[in-house]
Amino acid sequence: MDTVLIRDLVQTQEVEIKTGPFGTQLKASEYVDRGTPVLNVRNLGFSTVNTEKIEMVGNETIKRLSAHTLHTGDIVFGRKGAVERHAFISEFEDGWMQGSDCIRLRVKNERINARYLSYYFLTLSIDPLCLVCVHMVLLWRLLIKK
């Protein structure tokens, strides 16, 4: 089995990393009582989604911020807060929206098993401090590219 770094998969475009919409793009006033759920840091579990206190946005917001739509197999991390947690997006959450303080990892190559990656992120070999460093580097790289 080969050992591959996530950064190498990003560079070869086998995975895609995307930050959630910034506060200027998604305002608190856009949340509604009924609509499409928005996955925020508080909704991230350990490869699971916690639907308690989930917020929602309307169709116009979803259309405008379609680049932040989640798909089955995506892995969502928090950019701040509980960085040791993540959510593996199932068919149930397909079409939901990624929240502002989240980072989405999307597998673009069939040779990479997204579910395996999600399980790997749960193992003890991933130190939470390492995850903090990874998130800071990812955020820095994403901001520098713009």
Question: What residue ranges belong to the model's regions?
Answer:
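Active-site/binding-pocket entry motifs
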Residues: 15-16, 44-47, 82, 104
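Basic/aromatic-rich interaction segments and small domains that mediate binding to polyanionic partners
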Residues: 36
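Non-catalytic DNA-recognition/assembly elements of restriction-modification systems
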Residues: 1-22
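A short glycine-rich beta-alpha junction/loop motif
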Residues: 31-33, 95-103, 112-115, 132-146
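Short coil/turn segments at secondary-structure boundaries
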Residues: 19-27, 51-53, 132-134
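Short, basic/aromatic beta-hairpin or loop at an interaction surface
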Residues: 43-56
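A short beta-sheet element
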Residues: 40, 59-122
